[in-house]
A protein has these predicted regions:
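Glycan-recognition and catalytic cores of secretory/periplasmic carbohydrate-active enzymes
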Residues: 1-175
Length: 175
C-alpha cells in the first residue's frame, strides 16, 4: 500500500468525517499519516522502473525529506521538505491527534511546531526559506537575500496553528 504524494487529501478526509460522522474517512486519513515514512517509497520505486520518464526535471533531486517521508511522522522532530506540504501534513496530524486523543501524535505536533517557529521561521512569520523546491533547509538558515517564503506555506502554517490551538484546547493560545 502507498500514500498520497501531496498531503492534502488527509485534510479533506477529516473534514468529510466531521460532516458525515462516518469514521471510515477519519480512519483513512489516519492510515495515510501513519504509513508515511514507513517501508517503501513508491515515488522513488517508480523512478527505478525501466522506461520511466521524468515529467518534472526539478524532481531529479527528489528525496523522501521533500515529502516528509524520511521517517514515520511520530518520530519527526524537525520541519523538513516542501513547506506547504509539510504544514498541510502537520495540520492533518493535529486534527487526527485531536479526534483520536492520540498523545504521541500530539507530542509530535508540538515538536514540529516548536522547531518550525523557533528555528525555521522568519521574523515576519513566513516559513520555507529556499526557493529551490520551495522547502525548509536547516535550523537558523533564514537568508534575507534569497528568502522564498511562499504565501501558501504561511497560510498552511496558520492552518496548523489554528489546529494546534484546537488540539490543546487553548483559546487564546500561543499558536
Amino acid at each position: 500500500h502507498g500514500y498520497p504524494g501531496h498531503q492534502e487529501i488527509e485534510l479533506a478526509l477529516v473534514k468529510l468525517y466531521r460532516v458525515t460522522r462516518e469514521k471510515k474517512y477519519l480512519d483513512l486519513a489516519k492510515y495515510f499519516i501513519d504509513l508515511r515514512g514507513t517501508g517503501k517509497n513508491y515515488f522513488l520505486e517508480e523512478e527505478k522502473r525501466p522506461g520511466h520518464k521524468r515529467i518534472f526535471p526539478d524532481f531529479v533531486n527528489y528525496d523522501t525529506m521533500y515529502a516528509q517521508a524520511h521517517k514515520p511522522v511520530r518520530k519527526q522532530r524537525t520541519a523538513e521538505g516542501h513547506a506547504v506540504r509539510a504544514n498541510y501534513m502537520y495540520s492533518a496530524m493535529a486534527d487526527l491527534a485531536y479526534e483520536y486523543q492520540d498523545k504521541e501524535l500530539q507530542q509530535a505536533c508540538r515538536n514540529l511546531w516548536d522547531n518550525m517557529v523557533h528555528k525555521r521561521m522568519y521574523i515576519t512569520g513566513s516559513v520555507g526559506s529556499s526557493g529551490f523546491l520551495e522547502r525548509f533547509t536547516t535550523d537558523y538558515d533564514l537568508p534575507n537575500d534569497s528568502n522564498y517564503s511562499e504565501t501558501c506555506a504561511t497560510i498552511a502554517l496558520a492552518m496548523f496553528g489554528k489546529r494546534m490551538a484546537d488540539m490543546e484546547k487553548k483559546h487564546p493560545s500561543p499558536y
